[in-house]
Amino acid sequence: MIVDKQSDSAISKRKFRTGEVMLDIKKIFSLMGILALAFLICGVLELSASPRKHIIVIDPAHGGQDAGVKLTGKVYEKDITLAVALTLRKELAKESNLEIILTRDSDKEVSLEDRRKNIAKIKPDFVLSLHTNAGFGKSASGFELYCPEFNKDFKKDKKTAKGDVRQEKNKYLNDSVRSARSIQENLNTLFPRKGRGLRRADLPITEDLFVPAVFVEMGFATNPEDKNKLLSPDTQTEIANALAKSIKSFYR
C-alpha cells in the first residue's frame, strides 16, 4: 500500500491549525471574562467611593389654613417662606453632594408634629426653618437667627455612655452655631447693620430631635421697609442665594 506522505502532512497541519484556532478562541473568551470582571470591580469600587449625599431639610413655616403673619391683604408669612424655600431648593439642587427635602412644597398645612415626625424619619444632616418676624412695634427690623439649645436628655439606650451623649450633643450644637454664623455673615452682606444677633432657644421644629438646625426670621412683617423687601421677588431670591451660599460652604 502506497502512503501519500504529502496528504498526511496536510491533514496534520490542518489539525494543528484547528487546534491553534480553538486555543485562540479560548484565550479570547478568557480575556473577555477577565475584562468584564475588571470593569465590574471598578464599577463597584467607584460606587463605594462615591461621597455620601448630605441631606438638607428646608422647613417653610406655616401653610394652608395656618397662614402665619399677614403682610398684605393677600400675602402671608406662608407665601414668603415657601417662595424662598422653593428658590433655595432649586439652587442647592445644583450640588451633586446634597439631597434637598422640603417639609412642604405647596400651600398645604403640615402640622408641627408631622414635620417633626418626618424629620426624625429622614435623619437629615441639617434643618433650616424659615419664618418672618413680627411685633416689638414698627421700628423693629432686621433678621434673627436661632440655634437649638439641646437642653433635653438624649433618648439613648442604656448601653450609651454619658460621655458619648455629651460629645454628640456638643457636635450638633457646634455644627448649628457654625452654620448660623455663616448664614449671619451672608445675610449681613445682603442687609447691612440689620442683624439682630444669634440666639439659642428650644426650637419647636426640633423638639426631641437632635440634629444641627438653624431657625431664620428673615425680617419683620410689621416693619414697612422689611415688609417691602420680603414682598419683593428679587429680595426673596437674594435671601435664598445667601442661604444657599452658607449651606454649600458648610457641606463642601
Give short role names for the model-derived ranges.
Residues 45-48:
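Sec/Tat signal peptide C-region and signal peptidase I cleavage site
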Residues 54-74:
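Short glycine-rich His-centered loop
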